[in-house]
């Protein structure tokens, strides 16, 4: 058995690792995993009374075992203190959003004043578009992926209409080349250059929800900024999955959800990033509400709105404390594990999945049933692999579910598999591939 030394594993340098298609190898890898203890911090779902192989953290992350404790803390303060919990609770609700800034800043590569936890993803995207899509003169257009998550497209389409413009004329889509599924970065950058005088905004997901492709946001932002074009990023499938450096990359704004890789529960609270150059500009147009007002004068009930400095100035209503309590439980785990360590494990875990599917199942472009459409390059993917089915895809997915696999089906023909480094193991990956092999 060709296992790396412990120090080698901690760097996850799988280029020099010889994978093996055995349960013993997978278990030995798990034994050497420095992050293995975190699996015990989550509840594992069951199917038919048996623990499932859960590979669906890209759709809904698992529940941290500390969620109940965090919720009970807030329920106890509500029960015992009533309205006084805003000032005298264990974590006073009046300042609740401040308790998340440090953790979220680390996950997004931001300054603490550049991030705030609030609302839901598409709500926040609409709030950001109000401020950052400012069509003027020739610059009226928005550049997007052709196959972006539909909710983002709905938001953009309606924002364009709010400005009295035609979405068919103002939305420029970047398409894969003929015969390809994913985008080439040179094509994205060329599209920005081609339309540099027409673009008011570049809006992209950091990781595509369908293919699992990770984009080079640094290069995209540099090209946009070179031409004075605003750039916004949807981090739904990136935050908690890959390291980010939004401030250094000079991204203008970003938003995300917390119920996927951040494991904060169904409908979990979202958040936004607003770069300091905008957060310190009180004149920037925005939709406003009392929770975004200067904290020092919020309860003076003045009519004039004075926004807080930073991303907090985009808040509208007070914090949803119970939802955010669940969010805190997960962020505490991320603080302990560290996103860079998680990424290193993830690269190896997903590489092992890729290798097993190819070597044990023969999955490739010429396979009669399955093909992996996620890029082979680790720099162009997070933990997700997307398996495109060529025939009877939903039937295969249902068979996997019946065999104890919880994965994700996306129309029209993709099974999404996401081995999450916080709670998935090499044994999970090995057993999953054995089930796939038995059904092909």
Could you say what each language-model-derived stretch is?
Residues 11-440:
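Pyridoxal 5′-phosphate
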Residues 6-7:
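Polybasic, lysine-rich low-complexity intrinsically disordered segments
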